[in-house]
Amino acid sequence: VRNAYQGIGTEYETLLRAFDKENAAFAKRVGKDRAKTTYNKYLTVRKYVAEFIKYKYKRSDMSMNELTEEFIRDYCLYLKNVVGLAQSSIWIYSIPLKHIVTTAHYNGKIPRNPFAMYHVDPDHKEREFLTLDELTAMTEINLEDPNMAFARDLFLFGCWTGISFIDIKNLTEDNICIVNGAPWIVSKRQKTGVPFQIKLMDIPIQIIERYKSFRKDCHLFHIGDHGTINKHIKRVAAMCGIKKQVSFHVSRHSWAVLALEYGMPIESVSKILGHTNITTTQIYAKVTSNKLDHDISVFESRIKGHLPVIGGMV
């Protein structure tokens, strides 16, 4: 009787049941068009949601029909106060839940979407990036350890293409296309499936050629696990005197910042990064003071001569 009242009968969709179905379907796509890390995130969120339901409602599951804005707010507070997550992590762990709930709404399983009226703040922080001088230092340093050199070269490839680690790992010879006599990378982001393309400059071309003889299949690079590559990159950065928290993803940030700083329109930056909207790019790419100074100087030079003269003192 209680289950029927709460909508947990076999004919009703429950939240954890919906998670299990989504995760089972997701697992089949891992290694194809979905990343193992994202799958693990969905599993973690499923665990947190189950623990929250037990903590808050003293139950093992709940009907999708019971979900409200209050449920989402309390779940986020649970992640903050009980689990101890930072706001940025809470935002990340709310995304799979939002996907499950929104999909259920679109499929007619629930009459309303509680996420439509509740927004989880991502708490955007300043994105770390390397300056051109820092990139030059990492480029010019001589490395005797071939593993460290390879990690550095992959990092530089990301710095001059804006391509993420997993998408670099997925690149094959088929992703290189010749357009107007120049080589381009044309592919899709594994994370979102959004197409991206970028013309290859000299440094990424040199890196591709450098590791051609090391290929074991059609992939451009034979890359190990993310953690090992990151460890080598941090060591190289430290050897170059770089005090920043450097990880592989900093290469993508660095490309975006340099592209904007040297005048590439944000629409083009967004397209190359594979973003679905410019709002994401504005968060992702930090506009430096040098870029702002340049833009203001250009504005000043263009408007000079058109300004009215301030009248003298009365």
PLM ranges: what are they?
Residues 6, 10-46:
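Short, aromatic/basic-rich helix-turn unit that serves as a nucleic-acid recognition element
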Residues 37, 44-55, 81-115, 166:
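N-terminal DNA-binding recognition helix of tyrosine site-specific recombinases/integrases
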Residues 87, 91-93, 110, 114-165:
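Basic, Lys/Arg- and aromatic-enriched nucleic-acid-binding interface segment
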Residues 119, 125-128, 134, 170-207:
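Conserved tyrosine-mediated DNA breakage-rejoining catalytic core shared by Y-recombinases
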Residues 124, 190-209, 215-235:
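C-terminal catalytic core of Y-nucleophile DNA break-rejoin enzymes
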Residues 129, 189-193, 226, 273, ...:
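Catalytic-site neighborhood detector that most strongly recognizes the C-terminal catalytic loop/helix
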Residues 156, 160, 166-167, 235, ...:
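C-terminal catalytic core of tyrosine-transesterase DNA break-rejoin enzymes
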Residues 299-314:
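C-terminal secondary-structure termini that scaffold catalytic or DNA-interacting sites
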